[in-house]
Structure formats: C-alpha cells, structure tokens
C-alpha cells in the first residue's frame, strides 16, 4: 500500500540546485518578495500571461495560491517552484510543471516567468536545466511540453537553448492578456540528449 501511495501522491520535490540558482516549493513566507517582484514586473509580464485578477497580488490570493499548490502536489497534478539566485537567495522568478498526465502519457507542461530586473541573465535557463533531470528521473515523466507566443523571442530562445524541439503551431491556443493567442508548441523527451 505504501508503494501505491508514493506513486499516486508523491511528496513535494526537495529543493533543486542549478548553475547559480535554487528552485524550491513556494512558501507563505515568500509573499512579500513575490508580490514586490510581480508588481515591479507587471508591465514586463502582462503581455505574456493570462489576465491578472484585480486582487492577484494580495496576501489572501497568495494564501489561496499556496493551498492550490499544496493540493496540486499532493495529487501529482503540478509542481510549482520559485527560482532564487543562489548568491543572495533573492527571488528572481518562478516555474511550474503542470497538467501532469500519468498512464500512457507520462507528460507535463512547463510554465515560467522571470522578474523584469532579472531577465536575460541566464537564471531561467539555469532553472530549466536544473529541473529537467528531476522531471524525468524523479517524477519519471516521458515528455515535457511548453508553449509560447510566436513573438516571444526570449521564450523561444530559452526553450531551444534547453533542448526543446518545436513541434507545431496551435491557433488561439491560450487566452493571454485577455486575447486568444496562437502559440508555438515545443516538447522535450526523456530520451533527448541532456543540454
């Protein structure tokens, strides 16, 4: 019975370290740093994200987010991480391995964001490179998927630099910033060479 429980409801992943970054599960104590980084990055992030609710940066909304994160991990649906700069433990962004499908699929979808003041410094590249082995070797996924808006050159570069291959083009794939947007579809398989 313990084996079944481990497979169906894994514990949250431990912190993951990469080149200059540490990834760990978000905690309520991260609220101040998270809300400040998101607020100062609002203009930078909103073209690439779903519309933010009016209370998105409130403590109550963050508390609800923490509850959802815990439930998603408990049920093996998603694994969220905040990304911290290793040298001073400053929050620089976040990523999530979500929409986990078990059974014959063994796949999940990646989402990520980086604060405006930390963009183009290699933090998200290091974070993805650190997460990929855990996704394949610890969570035992076979396939990782990601999608990005065709005009998001930084995201395209990030995915290709971390070994994702473009697989397609999806029309009006996600509602981003209030508009149904086309997306490029990327994937990476367990058998693909590690970057």
Predicted regions and their residues:
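Acyl-donor (CoA/ACP) binding surface of acyl/acetyltransferases
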Residues: 1-33, 37-47, 80-195
